Swiss-Prot record:
InterPro entries: Chaperonin_Cpn60_CS, Cpn60/GroEL, Cpn60/GroEL/TCP-1, GroEL-like_apical_dom_sf, GROEL-like_equatorial_sf, TCP-1-like_intermed_sf. Its main location: cytoplasm. This is Chaperonin GroEL. The keyword Kinase does not apply. It catalyses: ATP + H2O + a folded polypeptide = ADP + phosphate + an unfolded polypeptide. Belongs to the chaperonin (HSP60) family. Transmembrane segments: none annotated. Keywords: ATP-binding, Chaperone, Cytoplasm, Isomerase, Nucleotide-binding. Together with its co-chaperonin GroES, plays an essential role in assisting protein folding. The GroEL-GroES system forms a nano-cage that allows encapsulation of the non-native substrate proteins and provides a physical environment optimized to promote and accelerate protein folding. Its EC number is 5.6.1.7. One of its GO terms (molecular function) is ATP-dependent protein folding chaperone. It is found in: Cytoplasm.
Length: 545
């Protein structure tokens, strides 16, 4: 077993604090509308330029192992804030640094670390309740746009695009961010249910200019197996031909004789048909076929429940106003399913989201909800260079997470004002003993640190602004972008309550652990083996005659 290096007490805490400061100082320069950029070197390609706190934190790895432990613990704060709310990473880091710095000063002055931690936890619990009372619902498009703008570092265009996307696909709709083709940001909305499976044969194409299949008022046959024998489908094909409607077949696969016969029928104009593979795999495919059935008021023909394709009737087929099939995607527009049944299905999937522990499963279930609820929006980010594209895309994703959080739990005054107001309300809070009360004071003082850092990054004097904001009431605060005091909500400077709450909770959680640390253990640095001794000089050859 390798030898260990062990540090105790203040020696350990000083080293840990040095690591915390290196990471936090690198991250906090990005906070606020006048926050600066950080340039990250890459082993290949151009460096990355970012104003995203968690991206900066993830890059930091220190040589000194004790300092590195401190840095990694604060990195955890930024990562947790990012995972839970998608934003607030820099705020969480600034709060953690402040609580740790003040807390370790109190420990050095002889306070009991465990009581300090209890005091900090007590203050944070009370502050969270206070934030909930300060919170205002984020209901209208204007408020959503403002939250998106603030989170995207005051980029109004991004805020407007996100608000427009939410307006079109609903609060539960899926909004994705992709690389755009031009210089402008664009929003593309896919109406109806879309899944990533295209036509099985190009001979089904009936719109040559767009290389797509477009069928109006079609029947939809949903089959949970491979179809290779045309005899199984004859009764359905005859019924559809008599009705004079087109048919879309969505099955695990359609191959061989069955596919060839469908192609021939289409080319001769006997019946308009298109075949598509069912989306997903395994159990997820079965669930998505069921979703399509509910959306189109059809039935999935499945041998598992004793149904046979040969006996399928027109009553078991789904219907939709229109279906568009391209090489890669199929879009079902205006399925005839009943609204109540679709709502019940959405509620059922939401229940599965609540119960699921896997992020991947949650994401896939959320996509299914969006497809049933009617739409997917794609924000295409435009930029001049690839470096700018990466930076901007990260900002748009942050803003998207922030707006979702705002819709979920409401908004509070931005610019660090909400935390200052919450701290002011708790000025008389006392602990069970003197040390706990000091812990409460440490947490309340730290709650001013985001406001001070925003002001500092804007080149103003933090103490002057903090005093002025403290004297004000309600949503009165300082707009660092315009250097104007006023009502933060009216100026459109909002932070999602969830983001502010989680930043404070995560920061206090990790800071509490660090304050109560008494010993740190790491691998001792390996001593280099002694170098090989020099070989004696080789004798030269004698002079040649």
């Amino acid at each position: 077993m390798a030898a260990k290096d062990v540090k105790f007490g203040s020696d350990a805490r000083i080293k840990m604090l040095e690591g915390v400061n290196v990471l936090a100082n690198a991250v906090k320069v990005t906070l606020g509308p006048k926050g600066r950029n950080v340039v990250l070197d890459k082993s290949f390609g151009a460096p990355t330029i970012t104003k995203d706190g968690v991206s900066v934190a993830k890059e930091i790895e220190l040589e000194d192992k004790f300092q590195n432990m401190g840095a990694q613990m604060v990195k955890e704060v930024a990562s947790q804030a990012n995972d839970a709310a998608g934003d607030g990473t820099t705020t969480a880091t600034v709060l953690a640094q402040s609580i740790i710095t003040e807390g370790l000063k109190a420990v050095a002055a002889g306070m009991n670390p465990m009581d300090l931690k209890r005091g900090i936890d007590k203050a944070v619990l009370a502050a969270v309740e206070e934030l909930k009372t300060l919170s205002v619902p984020c209901a209208d498009t204007k408020a959503i746009a403002q939250v998106g703008t603030i989170s995207a570092n005051s980029d109004e265009n991004v805020g407007k695009l996100i608000a427009e996307a939410m307006d079109k696909v609903g609060r539960d709709g899926v909004i994705t961010v992709e690389d755009g083709q031009g210089l402008q940001d664009e929003l593309a909305v896919v109406e109806g249910m879309q899944f990533d499976r295209g036509y099985l044969s190009p001979y089904f194409i009936n719109k040559q200019d767009t290389a797509s299949v477009e069928l109006d008022d079609p029947f939809i046959l949903l089959v949970d197996k491979k179809v290779s024998n045309i005899r199984e489908m004859l009764s359905v094909l005859e019924g559809v031909a008599k009705a004079g409607k087109p048919l879309v077949i969505i099955a695990e696969d359609v191959e061989g004789e069955a596919l060839a016969t469908l192609v021939v029928n289409t080319m001769r104009g006997i019946v308009k048909v298109a075949a598509v593979k069912a989306p997903g795999f395994g159990d997820r495919r079965k669930a998505m076929l069921q979703d399509i059935a509910i959306l189109t008021a059809g039935t999935v023909i499945s041998e598992e429940i004793g149904m046979e394709l040969e006996k399928a009737t027109l009553e078991e087929l789904g219907r939709a106003k229109r279906i568009v099939i391209t090489k890669e995607n199929t879009t079902i527009i205006d399925g005839v399913g009943e609204a109540a049944t679709i709502e019940a299905r959405i509620a059922q999937i939401r229940q599965q989201i609540e119960e699921s522990s896997s992020d991947y499963d949650k994401e896939k279930l959320q996509e299914r909800v969006a497809k049933l609820a009617g739409g997917v929006a794609v924000i295409k980010v435009g930029a001049t260079t690839e470096v700018e594209m990466k930076e901007k895309k990260a900002r748009v994703e942050d803003a998207l997470h922030a707006t979702r959080a705002a819709v979920e739990e409401g908004v509070v005054a931005g610019g660090g004002v909400a935390l200052v107001r919450a701290a002011a309300k708790l000025a008389d809070l006392k602990g069970d003993n003197e040390d706990q009360t000091v812990g409460i004071r440490v947490a309340l003082r730290a709650m001013e640190s985001p406001l001070r850092q925003i002001v500092d990054n804007a080149g103003e004097e933090p103490s002057v602004v903090a005093n002025r904001v403290r004297e004000g009431e309600g949503n009165f605060g300082y707009n660092a972008a315009t250097e104007v005091y006023g009502d933060m909500l009216e100026m459109g400077i909002l932070d999602p309550t969830k983001v502010t709450r989680l930043a404070l909770q995560f920061a206090a959680s990790v800071a509490g652990l660090m304050i109560t640390t008494e010993c740190m253990i790491t691998d001792a640095p390996k001593k280099d083996a002694p170098a090989m001794p020099d070989m004696g000089g080789m004798g030269g050859m004698g002079g040649m005659m």
